[in-house]
């Protein structure tokens, strides 16, 4: 195996039909408005970089064969050759292995070789000889993406030319190009790639436009996406997805004012559409996190609801979290009814837990219990958090008749009571004169928690003694000693008083001997 070399060494793909990119790759004939936009944005970008301190480019994190479990030996060997061999030697080393590859093998290796673009492209060429140059479209797309993500744009465009000759170009290919340029902070070149894509046989339609806008917005450049849309809409009419992409961009930026403007434009342009859930989802989530919070959000939510338009699960989850923080059960129930009753949007266990916790906090046990019982009908299932919430608040409110069956139910459903709830329960049941439930919980606790049980164990023994249950107190004191749980001398002293008073001195003597030997 050759000596390991720097990542960037010899990055040229050297593929027979991949020529260096020429300026003709940029759009030859832009409309006046588009040309003006590109010129202005380019000048602004140059200005920005001129006055910034030089910075290292964003270095993407690539998937590695080293971190991929259960990788077939052949794939691992090929990846290792690419990662540790000079580009000039890759094909020779591959030949010496005698390995035969399939289209699927090529795809797997390329996906794990982004860190080494030069050798990866050499591998692509080498494997093409075995496959009679019948690489899959996906493998070609991986090469384009691999080159683009390493900012090897000349070679990337040469690969695009080769794909064009083979009739393999698709929107997915250009989506990769857009993403690579944007992630390299070269938005204008992403836009120019969009402008020329029809020259490569790929339609420059609204789906392609949305792909470009999505790449720009994902990188936090929603303002530039919006600016370009104002130009592109002269020839391509935006659709619901266009606005959903922009609104998600404003959501990620936390830009409430821009979100309002885009939402208003959307309603004017395409009207109200019950199917446009992602747009409503992002818009309401943005408002909720804005300065006016729930008040403004509810105003827009009710406007949507009147038109039978609803957001998705993301908004409802964030809104329920807000209601729980502010103990706002009225709004929580209004949203819940809209979500479950009218929108047929199925809440998950986490959302049920939020509402159950809110009702338990406000001491509405009956409503919380109904929510717990209803969960399974909506495809959600209670977990340990659900039961522990119920158990915690029932104990806090001293509603022990309701708490006892909850404990039994959670054990039956293998949802473990947490340590804190077990300790609280033992204390509450002892304080309320119910040693049977206290003992039941203690038995479960010492079988499932192997540490931090000393304090509550001593409390139980003393509590049983105070409830005139001295035989049980002695029994569990002995059991604690046998299990290696420290029995405090103060606990032992109290047992001595009770046993001496009852004329059970020998019982105490036996307990003391056991205690001393441990």
Each model region followed by its residue ranges:
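N-terminal targeting peptides
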Residues: 1-176, 181-192, 196-200, 207-210, ...
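Pentatricopeptide repeat
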Residues: 102-106, 136, 140, 156, ...
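Alpha-helical solenoid repeat scaffolds, predominantly canonical TPR units
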Residues: 123, 159, 193, 228, ...
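The canonical alpha-helical register within tetratricopeptide repeats
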Residues: 126, 162, 196, 230-231, ...
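Inter-helix linker motif
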Residues: 131-132, 166-167, 201, 220, ...
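Residue-level detector of the short coil/turn that links helix A to helix B
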Residues: 151, 185, 220, 254, ...
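C-terminal interaction modules of eukaryotic adaptor/scaffold proteins
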Residues: 459, 463-518
């Amino acid at each position: 195996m050759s000596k390991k070399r720097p990542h960037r060494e010899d990055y040229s793909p050297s593929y027979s039909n991949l020529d260096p990119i020429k300026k003709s790759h940029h759009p030859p004939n832009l409309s006046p408005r588009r040309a003006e936009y590109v010129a202005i944005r380019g000048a602004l970008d140059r200005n920005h970089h001129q006055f910034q301190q030089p910075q290292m480019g964003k270095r993407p994190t690539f998937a590695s064969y080293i971190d991929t479990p259960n990788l077939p030996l052949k794939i691992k060997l090929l990846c290792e050759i690419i990662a540790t061999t000079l580009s000039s030697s890759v094909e020779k080393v591959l030949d010496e292995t005698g390995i035969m590859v399939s289209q699927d093998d090529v795809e797997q290796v390329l996906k794990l070789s982004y860190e080494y673009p030069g050798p990866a492209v050499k591998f692509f060429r080498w494997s093409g000889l075995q496959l009679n140059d019948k690489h899959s479209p996906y493998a070609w797309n991986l090469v384009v993406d691999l080159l683009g993500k390493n900012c090897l744009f000349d070679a990337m465009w040469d690969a695009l030319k080769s794909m064009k000759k083979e009739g393999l170009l698709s929107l997915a290919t250009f989506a990769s190009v857009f993403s690579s340029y944007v992630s390299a902070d070269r938005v204008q070149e992403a836009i120019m790639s969009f402008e020329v894509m029809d020259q490569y046989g790929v339609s420059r339609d609204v789906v392609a436009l949305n792909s470009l806008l999505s790449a720009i917005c994902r990188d936090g450049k929603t303002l530039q996406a919006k600016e370009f849309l104002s130009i592109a809409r002269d020839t391509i009419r935006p659709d619901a997805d266009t606005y959903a992409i922009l609104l998600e961009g404003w959501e990620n930026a936390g830009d409430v004012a821009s979100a309002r403007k885009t939402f208003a434009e959307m309603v004017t342009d395409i009207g109200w559409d019950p199917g446009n859930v992602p747009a409503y989802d992002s818009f309401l989530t943005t408002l909720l996190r804005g300065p006016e919070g729930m008040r403004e959000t509810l105003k827009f939510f009710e406007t949507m609801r009147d038109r039978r338009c609803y957001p998705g699960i993301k908004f409802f989850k964030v809104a329920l979290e807000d209601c729980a923080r502010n103990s706002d059960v009225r709004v929580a129930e209004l949203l819940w009814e809209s979500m479950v009753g009218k929108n047929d949007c199925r809440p998950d266990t986490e959302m049920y837990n939020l509402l159950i916790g809110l009702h338990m906090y406000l001491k509405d046990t009956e409503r919380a219990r109904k929510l717990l019982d209803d969960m399974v009908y909506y495809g959600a299932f209670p977990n340990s958090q659900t039961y522990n919430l119920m158990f915690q608040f029932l104990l806090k409110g001293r509603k022990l008749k309701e708490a006892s069956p909850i404990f039994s139910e959670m054990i039956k459903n293998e949802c473990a009571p947490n340590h804190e709830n077990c300790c609280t329960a033992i204390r509450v049941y002892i304080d309320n004169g119910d040693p049977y439930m206290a003992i039941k919980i203690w038995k479960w606790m010492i079988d499932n928690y192997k540490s931090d049980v000393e304090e509550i164990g001593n409390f139980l023994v003393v509590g049983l003694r105070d409830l005139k249950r001295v035989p049980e107190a002695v029994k569990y004191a002995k059991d604690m000693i046998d299990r290696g749980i420290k029995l405090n001398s103060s606990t032992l002293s109290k047992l001595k008083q009770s046993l001496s008073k009852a004329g059970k001195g020998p019982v105490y003597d036996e307990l003391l001997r056991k205690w001393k030997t441990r």
